[in-house]
Amino acid sequence: MAEFPASLLILNGKSTDNLPLREAIMLLREEGMTIHVRVTWEKGDAARYVEEARKLGVATVIAGGGDGTINEVSTALIQCAGDDIPALGILPLGTANDFATSVGIPEALDKALKLAIAGNAIAIDMAQVNKQTCFINMATGGFGTRITTETPEKLKAALGGVSYIIHGLMRMDTLQPDRCEIRGENFHWQGDALVIGIGNGRQAGGGQQLCPNALINDGLLQLRIFTGDEILPALVSTLKSDEDNPNIIEGASSWFDIQAPHEITFNLDGEPLSGQNFHIEILPAALRCRLPPDCPLLR
């Protein structure tokens, strides 16, 4: 095998007992690849490991986990100063893996690992909220976000996507649309939003295509707002994301401002952020990511 620069794998602590992953790493090491492995235990670990990766001089930092792990590692990478910043590699090990799935990362661990180490590094965008928090995939808001956040893990494990509908029915008396005003380039909307999706990537919630036209290197955010008066039909339609839904409002802009008279919550790659005012902007070509040559999210 051709020689490749060293890589550092930042592995989510929940995946440490993954025997196939251990075997894949050992096999690549036997073939001559240098792969350092670090395991996260708490928030902040990923940033420290990225700093260590720079001191080691690795060419790639691999995020081994779900969307949250990819978010942490990519955020740490774009905060690096200077030259020779490592590229991002992706090893999907989470329960949803929305970003990895949408960009075409192989499901097979050995293939995904080889791509993460030896794939072509492409400059991609990220998004930033209120000049602080970042997301690489999507920000989602509305009652759908509250349902997916609050649905018990045991119910999700037992029933999958149906669990969200059941939990939504149980919460019917407390679910209300979010009244808000959203502005962007050549875009202005005000009303009651059942679900809001602002995407650098296309899907969230374990496969829901909320922003099907999004690209990760076009310098734009895609916006989709689901409106409607009846909660139950809206809940079902948002899970199905019907293209013919008359209650879908779309927009595209390099930034969006969102204001609400009450506190609303956005889910940023799995992490909640609450407030009344949000400024969301694209960060063009913020980092390099190793992607397959046929990645559908590249223009």
Swiss-Prot record:
<feature type="active site" description="Proton acceptor">
    <location>
        <position position="271"/>
    </location>
</feature>
<dbReference type="InterPro" id="IPR016064">
    <property type="entry name" value="NAD/diacylglycerol_kinase_sf"/>
</dbReference>
<keyword id="KW-0067">ATP-binding</keyword>
<dbReference type="InterPro" id="IPR005218">
    <property type="entry name" value="Diacylglycerol/lipid_kinase"/>
</dbReference>
<dbReference type="GO" id="GO:0005524">
    <property type="term" value="F:ATP binding"/>
</dbReference>
<dbReference type="InterPro" id="IPR017438">
    <property type="entry name" value="ATP-NAD_kinase_N"/>
</dbReference>
<feature type="binding site">
    <location>
        <position position="95"/>
    </location>
    <ligand>
        <name>ATP</name>
    </ligand>
</feature>
<keyword id="KW-0808">Transferase</keyword>
<dbReference type="InterPro" id="IPR050187">
    <property type="entry name" value="Lipid_Phosphate_FormReg"/>
</dbReference>
<feature type="binding site">
    <location>
        <position position="220"/>
    </location>
    <ligand>
        <name>Mg(2+)</name>
    </ligand>
</feature>
<dbReference type="GO" id="GO:0000287">
    <property type="term" value="F:magnesium ion binding"/>
</dbReference>
<dbReference type="GO" id="GO:0005886">
    <property type="term" value="C:plasma membrane"/>
</dbReference>
<comment type="similarity">
    <text>Belongs to the diacylglycerol/lipid kinase family. YegS lipid kinase subfamily.</text>
</comment>
<dbReference type="InterPro" id="IPR022433">
    <property type="entry name" value="Lip_kinase_YegS"/>
</dbReference>
<keyword id="KW-0479">Metal-binding</keyword>
<keyword id="KW-0460">Magnesium</keyword>
<keyword id="KW-0594">Phospholipid biosynthesis</keyword>
<dbReference type="GO" id="GO:0008654">
    <property type="term" value="P:phospholipid biosynthetic process"/>
</dbReference>
<feature type="binding site">
    <location>
        <position position="40"/>
    </location>
    <ligand>
        <name>ATP</name>
    </ligand>
</feature>
<dbReference type="InterPro" id="IPR001206">
    <property type="entry name" value="Diacylglycerol_kinase_cat_dom"/>
</dbReference>
<protein>
    <recommendedName>
        <fullName>Probable lipid kinase YegS</fullName>
        <ecNumber>2.7.1.-</ecNumber>
    </recommendedName>
</protein>
<keyword id="KW-0444">Lipid biosynthesis</keyword>
<dbReference type="Pfam" id="PF19279">
    <property type="entry name" value="YegS_C"/>
</dbReference>
<dbReference type="Pfam" id="PF00781">
    <property type="entry name" value="DAGK_cat"/>
</dbReference>
<dbReference type="GO" id="GO:0001727">
    <property type="term" value="F:lipid kinase activity"/>
</dbReference>
<keyword id="KW-0418">Kinase</keyword>
<keyword id="KW-0547">Nucleotide-binding</keyword>
<feature type="binding site">
    <location>
        <begin position="66"/>
        <end position="72"/>
    </location>
    <ligand>
        <name>ATP</name>
    </ligand>
</feature>
<comment type="function">
    <text>Probably phosphorylates lipids; the in vivo substrate is unknown.</text>
</comment>
<dbReference type="GO" id="GO:0005737">
    <property type="term" value="C:cytoplasm"/>
</dbReference>
<feature type="binding site">
    <location>
        <position position="215"/>
    </location>
    <ligand>
        <name>Mg(2+)</name>
    </ligand>
</feature>
<feature type="binding site">
    <location>
        <position position="218"/>
    </location>
    <ligand>
        <name>Mg(2+)</name>
    </ligand>
</feature>
<dbReference type="InterPro" id="IPR045540">
    <property type="entry name" value="YegS/DAGK_C"/>
</dbReference>
<keyword id="KW-1208">Phospholipid metabolism</keyword>
<feature type="domain" description="DAGKc">
    <location>
        <begin position="2"/>
        <end position="133"/>
    </location>
</feature>
<keyword id="KW-0963">Cytoplasm</keyword>
<keyword id="KW-0443">Lipid metabolism</keyword>
